[in-house]
Amino acid sequence: MSSLLVWREKFQRFYANYSVYILKILQFLMGLLLFGMINSNIGFMKTASSVFCTAGLAVICTFLPLIVMTFAAAALVIVHFYALSMPIALVSVLIFLLMYIFYFRFTPGKSWLVLVSVLAFGLKIPFVIPVVFGLLGTPVWIVPAGCGVIGYYMIDFVKGSASALKASGTDGLAQGLLSFTKQVMTSREMWLMVMITAIAILVVNAVRTRAVDHAWKIASVAGAAVCIVVAAAGNLFLDEQISYAVIILSSVLGVAVGIVLEFFFFSVDYSRTENVQFEDDEYYYYVKAVPK
């Protein structure tokens, strides 16, 4: 354990010295993954889906605030949707506008949360998000997480319905537009995932803030258990087809990531816990002191 603590101290010193470069590298990798995922799934406009465009956007967004990357990703999605169907692009603009209003109202300055949520779902590890957000954030982080889930499913819907939306006739376009709008608004799988994410974030955050030993580990396991149980119940009672491999593997990975986060952000020695009692003129105080 002592050797791990030494490595943690070394890592923290290294990060303190080179944090600017580390963050920019991570921002570039996030942009590369994000724009690459969008272009590989809905690359209807060939110019915008090229490797040069993907890399160029990632490089440009590396040196700008993360909110710019969020807008760039939304713009790239809309461009691809427009290349497929203008009505779909207009509906998407309205949905993105509504999500931005909610984001700006509840979590300004946290645009990276939306991006991470989209990436996690795109990489088929959705249930890492509730554990990470519940441990590091507050219940308000449900808003950007939900926006990320909706954004991912919008891309997935269009990818799956591309052939219908490519119809040249007016009737085909109208039918495709109605189908897309219905999928976004009434998709049971999407809203189930939003609900799972919200409930799990609340559970993880509630457990993490309790004054119990190993609260972070318990919170991670509790959040993963909630994800597995609710997702399995959704498959059973709503007749959904969420992959059980994705459910289990992403939940297990969420627990593993939670343990790593605890090591770096909340590493304490529970074996040396002390319970202290003292008083003043008005109150008795019972304090549980856990050394770092």
Stretches with model-predicted labels:
Residues 1-17:
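Short, Lys/Arg-rich, polar N-terminal cytosolic tail immediately upstream
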Residues 20-74, 80-81:
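Hydrophobic transmembrane alpha-helices
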Residues 38-50, 80-94, 186-195:
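Structural signature of hydrophobic alpha-helical transmembrane segments
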Residues 51, 59, 72-146:
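Membrane-interface helix-loop-helix junctions at boundaries between adjacent transmembrane segments
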Residues 120-121, 129-240:
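Generic multipass alpha-helical transmembrane bundles of integral membrane proteins
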Residues 146-151, 225-230, 247-266:
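Alpha-helical membrane-embedded segments
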Residues 162, 209-210, 240-244, 260-277:
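Juxtamembrane/interface segments at transmembrane-helix termini
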Residues 268-292:
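Short, highly charged, low-complexity non-transmembrane loops/tails of multi-pass membrane proteins
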